[in-house]
Amino acid sequence: MKRIFLKGIKGGTGTTSIVANLACALRKSNVPVYAIDLDPKGDLGLHLGLAWEHLLGWSDYPDFASACEQFHQDNDGVRFLPYGSRSNLGLDFSSIIESCQQLNDSDDSWFLFDCPAHVDVHRYPLNEDDIFLEIINCDAICHSFAFKRLNALKQAESSWQHYFLTNKYNSASELESDLLQLWQSELPLIAPLYINKDEVIKEATAFRNVAINCAPYSVANDDFETLAGWLVSRASQNAQ
């Protein structure tokens, strides 16, 4: 069981689209992939084909067994669990994370958690084999937050693998190019890859789909395939 947590260092970094596209990229290897929406302000299901009017999710149920009724499967075979209508009848995100252990039907299973930006990293029940990706954009706010996070991680002596992943990178922007070069040279834990800004990601969502399905020859497809391969490599090192 491989657990990947993805969280924006602030709101609007594009975390949910990464979760959806990454899930579909991993699924291409014909392994079980689960995507869990922990964000009350997110809409992971929309990226994976869920009907616009669907409102129910795990937060509408008192226990995990009944919440499993809301698991859906997209055309690629990704199983996903929406957040729901925010009624919170008894479950919280920590119990959902822990309860997913019950679904672990294979050592090759991947569990991707779409985490809300406002919940601090240290509130998640993380294990030493977990990988936590904190999503950043090339702007001054993320730059400030990333170095603050780095200091907090050092003080907490975190045991999990923590990385900063750059999303929506625009190579035509001088500021973004300068920031990315600075991070790559001076920011520890920066992932050795980034996701380029690509209009197809937004267009795919309008069709309730992901970029790697709508535009298999796009830059976005290459980026998510690269991200999936890198995570497979990181997870394999954990298993050794």
PLM region descriptions:
Residues 2-40:
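Walker A/P-loop phosphate-binding motif and the immediately C-terminal alpha-helix
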Residues 9, 32-107, 206:
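P-loop/Walker-type NTP enzyme "switch/lid" segment
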Residues 36, 82-83, 112-114, 133-138, ...:
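Conserved beta-strand segments of the P-loop GTPase G domain that flank and frequently precede/overlap
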Residues 103-122:
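Glycine-rich phosphate-binding loop used to anchor ATP phosphates in small-molecule kinases
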Residues 120-140:
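Inter-motif core of Ras-like GTPase G domains
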Residues 141-162:
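Anionic-ligand binding region
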